Regions:
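N-terminal short beta-loop-beta anion/metal-coordinating cradle
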Residues: 49-74
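Solvent-exposed alpha-helices and their adjacent loops that cap or buttress functional pockets
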Residues: 9-12, 69-72, 139-142
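Phosphate/ribose-phosphate-bearing ligand recognition and processing surfaces
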Residues: 83-156
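Short, basic/glycine-rich phosphate-binding loops at helix/coil junctions
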Residues: 72-85
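Conserved acidic residues
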Residues: 16, 75, 111
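Conserved, mostly hydrophobic/aromatic
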Residues: 19, 78, 115
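Short gly/ser/thr-rich secondary-structure transition/capping motifs
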Residues: 1-6, 59-62
């Protein structure tokens, strides 16, 4: 499958579900200062999604977990373990994050989802590298859902 590539803010996308590039969930969430997509979710959506994801315990690298969207207008948030213990994204962590998030999308029959560029922020990989890995992973997935890959751009 091939996602639509859009520019903007993931929290402004008209979709049922958004993906949050998270960590392996080993450090307690309340000790972290979320940045990027996670920081925006915390600011606009509140703490509830992070409390819920914490209850899952450690997430395997590239794993995905489904939570509510807190105060955000989505049906859910899928948190993916896009970075390893050293806060670095790998080809494996990024591609498995895409594949495992799409498994949840398909299992729950969500019709639309927006992904950030996993691994390009806290994962310390460039946007082009991360996007290339994600697009290759999407090619291995079959889905009826509409998928957007959001290149962050602040819109005034």
């Amino acid at each position: 499958m091939e996602p639509d590539i859009v520019e903007g803010d993931i929290l402004d996308q008209n979709v049922e579900v958004i993906v949050n590039s998270w960590n392996r969930n080993i450090i307690p969430w309340w000790l972290l200062l979320p940045q990027g997509v996670s920081g925006a979710i915390k600011k606009r959506g509140g703490l509830e999604p992070f409390r819920q994801v914490a209850k899952f315990g450690p997430i395997p690298l590239g794993g995905a977990r489904l939570t509510s969207s807190g105060k955000l207008p989505y049906k859910a948030i899928i948190h993916v373990a896009g970075i390893n213990m050293f806060w670095f994204a790998t080809e494996y962590s990024v591609s498995q994050s895409v594949i495992n998030a799409m498994k949840i999308i398909n299992e729950k029959s969500f019709r639309s989802v927006a992904f950030p560029i996993i691994g390009s922020g806290s994962g310390n990989r460039g946007k082009q590298w991360s996007e290339r890995i994600m697009l290759a992973a999407f090619e291995t997935v079959d889905s009826e859902a509409e998928v957007s890959l959001v290149r962050y751009r602040k819109i005034s």
